[in-house]
Amino acid sequence: MLMRKMLLSVCLLLLAAATGFAQTFTEWQDPQVNSINRLPMQSTFRADESQIVPLGGEWHFNWVRSANQRPVDFWRTDYVEKAWSRMNIPGLWELNGYGDPVYVNAGYPWSGRHKNTPPVPPTENNHVGSYRKYIQIPAEWKGQQMIIHFGSVTSCIYLWVNGKFVGYSEDSKLECEFDLTEFLQPGKRNLIAFQIFRWCDGTYLEDQDFFRFSGLARENFIYTRPLKHINDVSITPDLDATYRDGTLTVNATVSDYRKTRVEMRLYDAEGQEVADPVNAVGSFVVGRFFVKNPHKWSAEDPYLYRLDVRLYEGKKCLQTLHFNTGFRKVEIKGSDLLVNGKRILIKGVNRHELDPDGGYVLSYERMEQDIQRMKQLNINAVRTCHYPDDPYWYELCDRYGLYMVAEANIESHGMGYGAATLARDTAYLQAHLDRNQRHVQRNFNHPSIIIWSLGNEAGYGPSFEAAYDLVRALDPSRPIQYERAEYDGKTDIFCPMYASQEYTKKYSADPSKTKPLIQCEYAHAMGNSQGGFKEYWDLIRTLPKLQGGFIWDFADQSIHWRNSRGKSYYAYAGDFNRSDSGADQNFCDNGILGPDRQFNPHAYEVQYFYQDIWSSLVAPGQVEIYNERFFRDLSDVELRWELLRNGDLQASGTLEDVNVAPQGRRVVEIPYGDVDNSAEWLLNLSYCLDDDEGLLPEDFVVARQQIALSEFNWTMKPLKSAARPKIRNSVAHQFTVSGPNFEIDFSVDDGSMIRYQVGGVNLLKSGETIRPNFWRAPTDNDFGASSQTKMAFWRKPKLEYYSLSQFDKNKLQVIVIEYRISGSDARVQMEYRINDQGAMEVTERLIPGTDRELPDLFRFGVQIPMPKSFENLEFYGRGPFENYQDRCSASFLGKWSQTVSEQFYPYIRPQETGNHTDIRWLRITDQRGKGFEFQAEEPFSASVLHYSIETLDDGDFKHNRHSELLKEDDVTNLLLDYKQMGLGCINSWSELPLPEHRLPFGEYRFHFSIRPL
C-alpha cells in the first residue's frame, strides 16, 4: 500500500509539472507539454443552469489550410474580423465546408503525403481554425470563480480572453477547463478567442479507426462556483464477503477548508435517507456509509442511490453537488470476472461516438436512441472505443444498465507495434500517463464502469506498464485491461481481438491459461456478416474462462453526403476528393446497425444469441424455461405461444406466470394439444415485457425461440402426367415441348431453355435462359478473404455444350443437356422432366473430373431471370429478414408474404443480399396472381431481387459504389440454390466462413420443381 501511494504521488507530480509553463507556441509539437494552466481533472457533475453561460451558437471563424498560414494576432481586442465567416459550436469543420472528411482505419490522416515524424505533425494541410466572440458575463458572478469548459477539442486549443493568453490543452476526447477569474469582467462583454489545430503531437496518440474530423464537439460553456468550493469527489462502492451488505466510501477535496465543513447524505431512489449523514472538516475529507443489504446495481437491475455533498460556511450552504451511485463489487477470482459475486456473461458491443450528420457532435436524443437500441438487442455491455465518451453517455449507462469497459484516448496504430511504437518512446511517457490519469479521475464515480482499458492498438512497452500501475493506484476496485499486453503483459483480463471459435476453445482447455478471456473486439460485422456467431456463443455458454466479448461494432460510420446530382447517400473513404486515396473504403461500416441506427439484418442474430431466456422441450406439452439472468427473476415477462402446422397458425395462448429465479429452471405446461409426424409442427415462444421498462415499451419481445415438435421431412410433390407432352422442331435451331396450355422452347445450339410460357405467362424474361449458377456478388468478408479472386473460376465459367438427349418416361418429356466446364474436365448436367400441364422437375448435377482440383463454390444452384412484373413473393421458409446457412437462428420458419422490392437490403456497399434458407416452397406472382411455385426434394435457399448478380458485383476490386445510387435492373432475378456458402464473421480481412459452412468443390445434385399457378 505504501509503495502504491508513493507511485501515485510521483506520477501525479510528474503530470502536474507540465501545467504551469508560459506559452511558447511550440506546445502543439511537444509531447511533454500536454497543457498550460489547464485545471486538474475532476469527476463529472453538472452545475445549475443559473451558474452557466452557454458558448454554443455562431462564432466569427477563420480557417486556413496550413498551420504556417494561421493568424497570429487575432486574439487582440482591436482585431477586426470583418472578412471572417461564421461557424457554429459545437461543430466540425469538414462537415461545414472547411476541408474534406477523412476516414482511415490504421494510419494517420496524412498517410501517403507526409512521413510520420513524431512528435512533429505536418505543417502542410494542418488546418487551423480561429474563433472569436464577445460573451456577456452576469454581473452577479463577481466575487466567484469563473471557469471555461470545452467538452471536446480536436486536436488542441490555445485560449485567450480579453486579449490575454489563458492556456493550452490537448487530448481531443476529454474536456479541458481553465480558470478565467482573473480574465473576465462580470457585467460586461468579454472577448473569448481561441485557435484549434487539426493535428498536434497528440494526434500521434489518436490514430483510431474512424472518421478524422476537426473542431469542437460536446458541450462548451462558462460556469461559476464559490471561491470556497469542493474541488472533487470520488465514490467507491463495495460489498462484504457475502455480497450482502454495502459500504460507500466518499473522498472529497476542498479548495479552502477554513471555516467550512462538508456534509454528505445518501438517499435511495425513492428519496429516503438510508444512512446517517457524514460531517467532516479539512481539505481532504473521507465519508463512509454502511448500508444493510442495499439494492445492488447491475446491468440487469441498475438501481441508483443519490449522494448529496454540500459545503457549508457556518449555516450557509455554499455549494451542493449531486451524484448518482450504485452498490456493486467487481473482482476477478480464479479465471472469472465477477460482478456482485456472479460470473456474468459479457454480451457486448464496441461503440464509436459518431453521427451521420454531426460527426462527433451527438445530441442527447441520439445517445438515448443508442441505449434503446442496445437494450432492444439484449446488449448488456459497451466498450467506449477508443476514447472517453460524452459524460451523458456514462450517465445513461448508469441509469439504464450497461456494463462498460471505459477506454483511454490512446491509439498509435500507425506507428506499428515494433521498435517505433510510442509505447517505448520516453518522450510520450507523460502523455500516456496524463490521458489515463485524467480519464480515471473524470469517470471514477460511474457504477456502470466495471473495467478500465489503457488504450487500443498502441503497442506495448514501459509507458503502458507505468499506466497500468498508475490506474491501479488510482483505483484498486476495478480490473484493468489492455489488448496489446496480450496474455503475459500487464492486463487483468486476456482481451484479444478476433480470436476464432477454435482458438477460444483451445484457450479454455489450456490449464496454463488462468485469466478470463473476454474479446475486446470480435464478430466483425462488416456488410452482410455475422455468420458463425452461434458457434461463438455455443462455446461461451459451455466452456470455462470464456465470458463473452464486444462485437465490432455498433453502427456503420458512414456519413450523409450528396453526389453532384444532389442525391443523398452514405459516404465512405474515397468519396470526398481526388487526393483521398480511399484505400480503406467502406471499412468504416462494420455495424450491426446502419448509420441512422436502423437494424442491419445481422442485428437480429445478435439479438437472438444475446437474449437471457431459453426454452427446451422436455416432454409433449412441457417446456423448460432457463433464466440466464444473474440478478433478476422473470416476474417482469409473460410467455406468448403459437402452434404452427406447416406454417399455418393452429392455436395460441399466453402464460402470465413464468417466473423463474436467476440462473434457475422451471417446467411449464403449454396446452397446444396433440401433434403427429404427418406434418411439420412448430412451437413459437415469445417472452414479452408486461410493463414499460426503461426505454423498452410494454409487450416488447425480450426473448423468443422456435421449437420443432414433430419429426417431419419435407419433400416436394411428385410430378404426374396424364398425357405425354408434344415435342416438335418449331423454328431453326430450337425445339418446343408443348401441351394444351404451355410451350417450352429449347435451343438446339446449346441446349438451354429459352422460353417457358404457361397460359400466356412467361417465366423467363425475353432473351434469358435458366442457367447453372455458382456465384454471388462478393460480400465484404468475401473481399477480405480474397474469395472474389480465389474463387473467380466460378464467376462465369464457360459451359461448353457437349450433348443433348430427349426421351419420354412415365408420360413425361425428359430433356438432358450436358456441358463441360472449360478449363477442366468437370461437367454440369441439366435434366428437365416436363408433364402435360407445363410443370417440370429440374435436376442439376455438378460432376467432378479427375484432372484438377477446383476452388470452393459460392453457391450451387440456378439463375432464372424473370420479367420484372413478377413482384409478389410468398414462401414457407426462414424469415422474415434475410438469412444464410451460418446466420439463420433468429429467422424462424413460417409462411411469409413479401414483395420482391423488399428483398434488397441496402448495405453501404452493394453486395450479396436477400437470401432465405430452409425454404419448403416458394411462389412468385404478378399483380394478376399469375406465376410459378418452386419446391425441392429437400429444403433449399433462394433469393429474388430486381438486381442481377452483375449489378451488385464489384469485380476483382472494390469500387466506391453505394446502394442508394444503384438503379434496379429490368428483371426479377430468381436464384434457387441447393446451398450457398456462409458469411463468416471472424474478421473481414482474411478469414473464410467455418469449414462446415463452405461448399468445397465436389459432386452436387439439386433436384427441384417448377409449377405454374
Language-model-detected regions and their locations in the chain:
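Glycine/proline-rich low-complexity spacer/linker segments in large multi-domain proteins
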Residues: 24-34, 42-46, 166-167, 186-224, ...
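Extended carbohydrate-recognition surfaces in non-catalytic/accessory domains of CAZymes
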Residues: 23-149, 200, 204-208, 213-216, ...
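Accessory beta-strand-rich segments of carbohydrate-active enzymes
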Residues: 27-30, 40, 62-64, 92, ...
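An acidic-aromatic loop/edge-strand motif
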Residues: 24, 100, 107-121, 170-172, ...
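Intrinsically disordered, low-complexity Pro/Gly/Ser/Thr-rich segments with frequent PxxP/GP/PP motifs
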Residues: 278-293, 647-678
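Extended acidic/polar, glycine-enriched regions
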Residues: 185-187, 251-331, 676-677, 681-723
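Extended substrate-binding grooves/exosites of carbohydrate-active enzymes
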Residues: 23-47, 89-92, 201-204, 210, ...
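Beta-strand/loop-rich accessory regions of lumenal/periplasmic or secreted enzymes
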Residues: 95, 104, 152, 198, ...
